[in-house]
Amino acid sequence: MSITAERRTALISEYKQSETDTGSPEVQVAILSERIVNLTEHLKTHKKDFHSRRGLLMMVGQRRSLLDYLKRKDQARYQSLIERLGLRR
């Protein structure tokens, strides 16, 4: 369900804005998206795992908030991120 340290490092290096960037909205959204995909796969096999489903909904809400923030602050970065991640919006 969780992502490995190597995968997290790869996501950070792919979406970072500067050399020391680990907490920009782009990086946070990329990590959350990876966790959401993993948890969705888990829930496909464990349909009655409602505790994990609640965690999934919280992660989706957090990602939505970060995307809304990024859209408000910098429309170009927002568009670039959703295209790179393949999100619907």
UniProtKB/Swiss-Prot annotation:
Protein origin, superkingdom: Bacteria
Gene3D superfamilies xref list: 6.10.250.3130, S15/NS1, RNA-binding
InterPro entries per UniProt: Ribosomal_uS15, Ribosomal_uS15_bac-type, uS15_NS1_RNA-bd_sf
Protein keywords: Ribonucleoprotein, Ribosomal protein, RNA-binding, rRNA-binding
Entry keyword annotation includes RNA-binding: yes
CC terms in the record's Gene Ontology section: cytosolic small ribosomal subunit
SS bond partners: none
Pfam families (alphabetical): Ribosomal_S15
GO BP term, example: translation
GO molecular function: rRNA binding; structural constituent of ribosome
PANTHER family: RIBOSOMAL PROTEIN S15, BACTERIAL AND ORGANELLAR (PTHR23321), SMALL RIBOSOMAL SUBUNIT PROTEIN US15M (PTHR23321:SF26)
HAMAP family: Ribosomal_uS15_B
Functional note: One of the primary rRNA binding proteins, it binds directly to 16S rRNA where it helps nucleate assembly of the platform of the 30S subunit by binding and bridging several RNA helices of the 16S rRNA. Forms an intersubunit bridge (bridge B4) with the 23S rRNA of the 50S subunit in the ribosome.
Subunit structure, interactors included: Part of the 30S ribosomal subunit. Forms a bridge to the 50S subunit in the 70S ribosome, contacting the 23S rRNA.
Family: Belongs to the universal ribosomal protein uS15 family.
Name of the protein in its database record: Small ribosomal subunit protein uS15
Organism: Gluconobacter oxydans (strain 621H) (Gluconobacter suboxydans)
